[in-house]
């Protein structure tokens, strides 16, 4: 495996570094007083369920930042070019993550489509993948279960075919983005 960044990845790393320095770090003092719900990278799932107007004020700030990042080409980073992404390598994504970790603001770049990206086929690409990439839909991910934790070999949830649909039967503990 080549651990060197391509010229495009080096350029992207510098863009992310500038975004963090110019957009995120200046907001750190304001976010120091933010509700605890914004701790960690999975704040979206919890924050959207809140009735607290203060939480929704921070959500608006984050949504503005997401739109700015997308406008600057800092979105769809690991999505293949054929779907409108930048097709950044794993090493490139590590460089991006290193830059994002230089701020205490819990900010991520992208819509988390990697879980469905390589498994969608035919009509599923148009129905699920592309709307997620465009930000029209959000994918949810549920691995953890009460009896198995996050061990995929011990999963008990089943998906039984039922005509054109599936009947899903089981319990998940921490389904990411299930509220969307």
Give the location of each predicted region.
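Intrinsic disorder at enzyme termini
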Residues: 1-16, 159
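Short amphipathic alpha-helical coiled-coil/interface segments
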Residues: 16-17, 69
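Surface-exposed helix-capping loop/turn segments at secondary-structure junctions
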Residues: 24-31
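Glycine-rich flavin
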Residues: 31-180
């Amino acid at each position: 495996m080549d651990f060197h960044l391509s010229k495009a990845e080096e350029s992207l790393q510098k863009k992310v570094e500038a975004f963090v320095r110019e957009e995120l770090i200046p907001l750190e003092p304001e976010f120091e007083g933010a509700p605890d719900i914004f701790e960690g990278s999975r704040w979206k799932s919890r924050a959207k369920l809140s009735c607290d107007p203060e939480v929704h004020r921070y959500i608006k700030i984050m949504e503005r930042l997401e739109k700015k990042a997308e406008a600057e080409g800092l979105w769809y980073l690991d999505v293949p070019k054929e779907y409108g992404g930048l097709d950044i390598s794993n090493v490139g994504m590590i460089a991006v993550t290193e830059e994002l970790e230089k701020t205490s603001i819990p900010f991520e770049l992208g819509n988390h489509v990697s879980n469905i990206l390589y498994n969608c086929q035919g009509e599923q690409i148009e129905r699920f993948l592309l709307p997620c990439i465009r930000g029209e839909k959000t994918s949810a991910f549920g691995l953890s279960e009460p009896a198995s934790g996050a061990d995929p070999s011990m999963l008990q949830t089943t998906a039984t075919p039922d005509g054109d649909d599936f009947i899903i039967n089981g319990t998940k503990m921490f389904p990411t983005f299930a509220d969307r």
